[in-house]
Amino acid sequence: MSTVKVNGAKNGGERMVLPAGEAAAKYYPAYRENVPKKARKAVRPTKLRASLAPGTVCILLAGRFRGKRVVVLSQLEDTLVVTGPYKVNGVPIRRVNHRYVIATSAPKIDVSGVSVEKFTKAYFAKQKRSGPVKKDEAFFAENAPKNALPAERIADQKAVDAKLLPAIKAIPNMKEYLAASFALSNGDRPHLMKF
């Protein structure tokens, strides 16, 4: 604050004045500008359940393979890597959100022989299409080429199945258990079931 002399007998002689930078604005906008709220949420890594350890038999609750029993191979940062195995119930190696899975109390399958280092986010990423695709032509195309599964994925599936099948056969009735689908019928109470 600085003092400025003021003329006039009734004005007190001097007045305290703010510096130019701190003075109140002479112009106010007609519309108030929206100030974004400060985000109070932090992005934290997903905490996967302790029951979803590698080798656990789980039931898928959603998606194309809902009702199928699968074996957990590994945990990524936010998802699980599971397989049927494909030879037993047709479920390939895929990523699954842990919220859509029920861990069962079935005996764990030994997956120590399966190498899971290559199953990362990049491994499951979709391949980008090359060149622009016109919507009308793609919609009405009858003999459109289907995306073929890479030979690498097929070889990986066969390698995983070859390691898992002996471990599954070592546990009595496990192969039949994995091959059978899970479903609810009238009168079933899932909240009272022990999986």
Swiss-Prot record:
Question: Where in this chain does the entry annotate a coiled-coil region?
Answer: none
Extract one GO molecular function annotation from the record.
structural constituent of ribosome
- InterPro entries per record: 60S_ribosomal_eL6, Rib_uL2_dom2, Ribosomal_eL6_CS, Ribosomal_eL6_KOW, Translation_prot_SH3-like_sf
What GO terms fall under cellular component here?
A: cytosol; cytosolic large ribosomal subunit; nucleolus; nucleus; preribosome
Source superkingdom: Eukaryota
Q: Per its UniProt record, what Pfam families does this chain match? A: Ribosomal_L6e (PF01159)
Which keywords does this Swiss-Prot/TrEMBL entry list? Cytoplasm, Nucleus, Phosphoprotein, Ribonucleoprotein, Ribosomal protein
Q: How does it assemble?
A: Component of the large ribosomal subunit (LSU). Mature yeast ribosomes consist of a small (40S) and a large (60S) subunit. The 40S small subunit contains 1 molecule of ribosomal RNA (18S rRNA) and at least 33 different proteins. The large 60S subunit contains 3 rRNA molecules (25S, 5.8S and 5S rRNA) and at least 46 different proteins.
Summarizing the function annotation, the protein's role is: Component of the ribosome, a large ribonucleoprotein complex responsible for the synthesis of proteins in the cell. The small ribosomal subunit (SSU) binds messenger RNAs (mRNAs) and translates the encoded message by selecting cognate aminoacyl-transfer RNA (tRNA) molecules. The large subunit (LSU) contains the ribosomal catalytic site termed the peptidyl transferase center (PTC), which catalyzes the formation of peptide bonds, thereby polymerizing the amino acids delivered by tRNAs into a polypeptide chain.
**Stated name of the protein:** Large ribosomal subunit protein eL6
